[in-house]
């Protein structure tokens, strides 16, 4: 094994400060695994880091990539339950304190000291990544690596829509934002028995909105550049609004729309991130007695459930995977996602999968 490897590195807090560079192969500790990365998918946050658009400042330099799967190449001598050669996927919490109340009760995704791969710890857009064994999950042989790279966003969507939001059979659900998380949340809502699921985007989202309706079962797509999503929702059904609104965009405009379109006693779940200030009153939320719920990341239980669902074909992932490409083509993959021409790109740092 070479002592260095190519990696996609974010090196400064400015637009375009990402490049492919040679970095050392990481050393592992007694409770770590060295994972040979077979597939790593590009997240919208990776593109935002490339364009310096995140609302927070990640560590620099840092290797990007937090949605990945591969083989165990090497194990620390205190790791149990895994062996070299095992097919695995990894959670994203590269560092947690392990001793706070949240960590001890299984909510380690909310640990105040959490540091995620690709943001505050080196990620997987490279050939090998150091992973704490507590992050590892076994992968069934019949789950291909091109799909297992999407287990992380599937887990985000499931945790948002099935754990932090309790969709009831027959519920009217609206998803704002047809990005990967929005398209996956749409699928989870349908799994949970939602009656109607609308999805809203802007003109640039037209290809994704078409996928949502034609391939993923959305009841209706709303082009917010042509019609008011709030009016569309309120003119549907009994006129009181949606039982559940999933805000997978996260900016002020969509949060305001969410609060305006949710029905009295309903729930808005915000899973999208956005740097823009709120700048409007939240009083309508109070008047409606509605709930505003945040959803962040996922935990072990969610991951195990999602692995079963993806392996059994309950998620439709092929329409979302627009590109499978070598690591060296990272910039083209980022650009196509930025342009919203493609939904999801999967990079293969160690050759074809």
Give names to the regions the model predicted:
Residues 194, 199, 207, 219, ...:
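Glycine-rich phosphate-binding loop and adjacent beta-alpha segment
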